[in-house]
Amino acid sequence: MKYVVVTGGVVSGLGKGVTASSIGVVLKACGLRVTSIKIDPYLNTDAGTISPFEHGEVFVLDDGGEVDLDLGNYERFLDVTLTRDNNITTGKIYQSVIDRERRGDYLGKTVQVIPHITDAIKDWITSVAVIPVDGRVGPADVCVIELGGTVGDIESMPFIEALRQLSYSVGQENFCLIHVSLVPVLGVVGEQKTKPTQHSVRELRALGLTPHLLACRSAQPLLDQTKEKLSQFCHVPAGNILSIHDVPNIWHVPLLLRYQDAHNAILKQLNLLSIAGPPDLQEWTKRAETFDNLTETVKVAMVGKYTGLSDSYLSVLKALLHACISCSLKPVIQWVAASDLEDEKAKEAPQVHAAAWETLKDSACILVPGGFGNRGTEGMILAAKFARENQVPYLGICLGMQISVIEFARSVLGLEKANSAEFDPDTPDPVVIFMPEGSRTHMGNTMRLGSRKTFFCDHNCITSKLYNNPDHVDERHRHRYEVNPDSVEALEAAGLKFMGKDETGRRMEILELPNHPFYVGVQFHPEFKSRPGRPSPLFTGFVLAASGRLKAYLS
C-alpha cells in the first residue's frame, strides 16, 4: 500500500479536503485505484452530535456513518463509496484502546499514548486502507490520508507521531507527505510572504516529518522567487512546490495539479512511475470550462436555519451545482434565513423581514433543507405555503418534507395547531412524530441512518419518472422524526399524495402535490449520492421545473 498524507499549517480552512480529493483525482486519472481516510483530532466519536456551525454539514455514508464533510468531497471527486471507518477521530481511537484495556488485552501493562494509542492509529489506517471502495475486488493502490486541523495543535500530536512511525515502518518509497500552507500577501507591502509556511514546516520537521511537496494556498499564482525562497528554507525542491491559487471553481484544482506535474512528483516519491500513465482529465477539463462559460442563471431560494455558514449545506449546494451544469444553467443561491420570514421578525426588524420576503419572491424555486430544532420552522412553513399557493417549484428535504406536511395540515385541513412533536410535544394534531425505534436518552448514532429502500406507490408520479421508474430507490437517511402514519389518510384525501414508502408501508418517504409544477418532499437526503457526472434525479427535476423545462424533459 502506498500512502499520501496531507497535512495543513498556519490556519485551518485552507482547503485541505479539496486538495486531498484533487490529488486522488489526478492519481486515479493516471490509472491507479485510490481510497481515502480523514483523520479528525476531536474527541467526539463521530460528527453526528456536532452543530453545523462547528464543522459544517454532517455527511452521511451508505453504512450510516455520520462523518466529516470532507468525506463527501472524497466521494464526489473520486466516485467511491466510503465507510464509517474511513473517518478516524480521537474519540474512536481512545474508545477502542479503553475497550481493549477493560478486556485485559494489554496483559497488565500501563496503557500509554505511545505505544498503545499510536499503535491503534497505525492499525486502523493499515486495516481500512485495504478495504475496496470503488466496487472492485482487492485493495486500492494508493490511500490518501488527510489530517484535520493544523500542525502544532495539541490534539493532533498522537496522530503526527503515528504517521511518523508509519512512514518509517512502510519505508520512504511507500510514503509521500504533502503539506498545505498559506502564502499571504500583506496589503501594504504587496509581497508574497513565506514566513508562515517556513514556521509551519519547521514545526512539522521538529515532530519528525519532512514534507515531500508543499501545496501553497494563495490568491494569485506563486512567483518563481517565492518558490525559490520556500525551497531554500523548507528543504523542498522548487519543482515540488505547488501553487494552489484561487480559481473560478474547485474543478480547476485537479487541473492545476496536473499542469504543475504534481502527479509525477508524487509517483516518483512512491516509485510508481513505471506503472502509472499520463493523467486523463478530459472530463474534468470539460466540466470546469463548461461551468466557467455558463450564462443563463436560475435563482434558488435556500430557506434554512444555518445560512450563516454555507458549509452547513455543502452537499445540497454541490447537488444543485451538478444538476444545474447538466441543464446548462448557472445556480444563483439566494440565502434566506428562515427566522427572517416570520411575523415576529416584522416587529423586531421590519427591513430584514421585508428583504427576506423580497428575496424569496424573486427566486425561481424554493428549497428547504434538513435541520434540527424549532428555530426558524415557522418561517419555513410560510415559505412552503408561498410555494404551494403560487405554483413555485418546491423541494423539501427531510425537515423540509415534514414542514410541507405541517403547512398542508394547517392550511388545507384547517388544523391550526398541527405541528411536529419535535417542535411542540403537546400539539393536539401531531402530523410528525418521534420514530418508534428512536432513543430519547442518547443523541449519538440513534437516528435512522444510512442507505434505505424507498418503494414507489405510483409510477406516474414526477419522482418515479425522474428516477426512470424503478421499483425502489436506495437513498441515505438521517432523521428521528417522521410523518405520522395516522395522519396520512386525511392528508391524502385533501390532495397531498405520498408516492414513496418504506418496505413496511407505514413510513412515508416521498410526497407530491398533483396539479403543481413541482412540489416534492422527501424524507431521505438525495444530495449525499449526487456526483458531478451523475446528478441527483430530484435536483435535476427541481432545476428543470424552475426553468420551465421539466414537462418537456419528462415527455
Task: Show which residues each predicted segment covers.
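Flexible phosphate-sensing "switch/lid" loops adjacent to ATP/NTP-binding sites
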Residues: M1-V332, A338-C365, F372-G373, M380-F386, ...
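Active-site proximal loops enriched in glycine and acidic residues that flank catalytic Cys/His/Asp
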Residues: G8, K38, S218, H245, ...
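Cysteine-nucleophile active-site neighborhood
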Residues: S21-V25, A29, T359-I462, P526, ...
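Short low-complexity, flexible loop/linker segments enriched in glycine and/or proline
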Residues: T49-P52, E228-K229, A409-V412, P514-H516
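Short glycine-rich loop/turn motifs
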Residues: N174-F175, S451, R507-M508
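Acidic/polar loop patches that form or flank catalytic/metal-binding clefts of enzymes
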Residues: G239, I275-P279, L395-G396, L415-A421, ...
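C-terminal and late-domain segments of enzyme folds
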Residues: D458-S555
